[in-house]
Amino acid sequence: CNLGGVVDEVDILECGYSLIAAEGARVVKIFREMYPNKPLLADLKIVDAGSKIGGMLLDGRPDFTTILCACEPGTITSVQAEAKKRGLNTKLQIELYGHWSFEDVKLWKELGISQLTLQHSGDKPGGWDEEEIATLKKLCDMGIDVAATGSIGYDDLEKFRGIPVSCFI
């Protein structure tokens, strides 16, 4: 997997859900070996079995990994423990998709989560709507880093003006 000159132009390399599902956690290790100095995201959206699944991903030494918002708090602490066991400073991102609440966000902050990713479903017709933009703003106002992902086109960028989105994925 040679990314050529593209690797110099992107801020973060992502081993996405589909890639990891198709090829296994080994792709995280491969990317890390090929690009040791580039920030790396392992985006498997862990929802359960944090020690096992998280451990497999963390063996590849990603800088970031995602946990789906539907998980139990124990999943978060299990992945955190696996990172600590490996001496890693991997940041865990909670991906907001489907059902979650602002009370959940408060709990995640208490558990040490400092990054969220707000997902616009690829199965939802159209781009980001006013409700999603308002949610994104409210999350940012809560003092947590929020990334925006899913169905973002060049023409959509104006909708995000004035909102301190940490990054677009």
Predicted regions and their residues:
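Conserved anion-binding
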Residues: 49-145
